[in-house]
């Protein structure tokens, strides 16, 4: 037992229950058939792994029923050695089981580490695919800014036309008297569109030829199938008329404006607060209002800005004097600044040059429904949502806050509209005022031009007045002759009696007299009234001539 204890101390602690079981078995063998009483104890103490050595020991007992003391010790040592081996085997069995588990864990860890990497790569690829930014047509960029933007934003390559359009283009280019041959068409497409790879993919040309033949766009002059010569069919007149009718019917209603073109102007008008620096205001005013001559006389602009700040129409956020940043003040929706041309120029400059231009979706919805209602408001809102998504994909807009069709958006490129685009009503009103001023000026000029002609008419009328006076005097002279009272008829009668016989000869002599001819020369002798007056004058002048002749004779 001492040897057993000494050996037990050196044995692994897992082997202790096995040793205790072996000792109990040895005690049972020495007793007289005590197996019935000890069996439940053995079963309770021994584990399932100890069952195989029990069977071996039972066989050994049958072979050697009467062992000696030395043999007992040897048996105990052998049993101990045999019992020592199973835990080693069990530990060895446990190790290989644990190894694959650890390997599986490492593989799982590696897989889990690889999965996020793949997800990140997929996300980056998706972003690269989505973000194909282009520069919009409404962006106002200088040459240097445009070059910089083209470097930063990978421009999407212009897509080539479809195969059907390429085929018709090739047939027209290679057309001859007998049409365009398939060989010439193939060479043309390979030379002009190498990206198609028609050398390897000849079926593309065959399919396109078949499609166009079925549609009636082209006609086969020679050959059959995908060989021979082809000609583009000219469009007949009836379909053109139908197209024109369709176009006319389409033009009857007002053409709808695309919301893509409306958005930048909407952002410019709805962005609040509106502010701009002095340099940007000066640049805008000098560009769109050259009459003010701000480049030559910058003091006018500075004085106008300072005056607007003093009146409370503008608020100076940064800087002092005429330098810094200025912000528009409003009463409700109308700005306080306005009136003179300089103030209107400053107002339009601050509204246009305000950066960055941001706007909320609620304000956008209200603006679109008021200015571009369309046939159906719900459909218009759907279009607005789609346009916002499209502009965001193209890189024209950025969503600052919110998700989807809510939040705030911002223009990615600068947009500086002209005053006519920004305030069309005011511009038209200003142009009307200018037209009125021009009309007034023209009318005043015309009146000034018309003033001298009245003077000329007066100058021309003066002789007419003199003629009228002479005529009236003559008429007065003639009238009393006609209306002479009966008492004076006896005195006046002898003069006309003597005058007619003597007036014939002096009348002939008096006609060539220059005094008589020169006087009527200034007046208009064409009028019959003047001729009648001259006839009335002649007898009176004849009398005076007769008197002079009588005096000379005497």
From Swiss-Prot:
Composition bias type Basic and acidic residues, residue spans: 94-129
InterPro entries linked to this entry: H1/H5, Histone_H1/H5_H15, WH-like_DNA-bd_sf, WH_DNA-bd_sf
Compositionally skewed regions (Polar residues) per UniProt: 72-93, 142-156, 464-475
Localisation: Nucleus; Chromosome
Start-end of Acidic residues biased regions: 60-71, 430-451
Positions bearing Phosphoserine: 6, 144, 157-158, 249, 443-444, 447
The H15 domain, residue ranges: 159-234, 255-330, 337-413
Database matches in SMART domains: H15
GO terms for cellular component: chromosome; nucleosome; nucleus
Modification sites for N6-acetyllysine: 192
An example molecular function term from Gene Ontology annotations: DNA binding
Modified residues (Phosphothreonine): 51, 85
Main location: nucleus
Crosslink position(s): Glycyl lysine isopeptide (Lys-Gly) (interchain with G-Cter in SUMO2): 64, 97, 258
Placement of sequence motif PxVxL motif: 255-259
Keyword Magnesium: no
N-acetylalanine: residues carrying this PTM: 2
Sequence ranges of Basic residues compositional bias: 238-248, 490-511, 544-554
Pfam families: Linker_histone
GO biological process assignments: cellular response to hypoxia; heterochromatin organization; nucleosome assembly; regulation of cell population proliferation; regulation of DNA-templated transcription; regulation of nucleus size
Task performed by this protein: Component of heterochromatin that maintains heterochromatin integrity during G1/S progression and regulates the duration of G1 phase to critically influence cell proliferative capacity. May play a role in hypoxia-induced oncogenesis.
Domain writeup: A central region that included the first H15 (linker histone H1/H5 globular) domain binds at the entry/exit site of the nucleosomal DNA.
Protein name as catalogued: Heterochromatin protein 1-binding protein 3
Species in which this protein is naturally found: Mus musculus
UniProt lineage: Eukaryota, Metazoa, Chordata, Craniata, Vertebrata
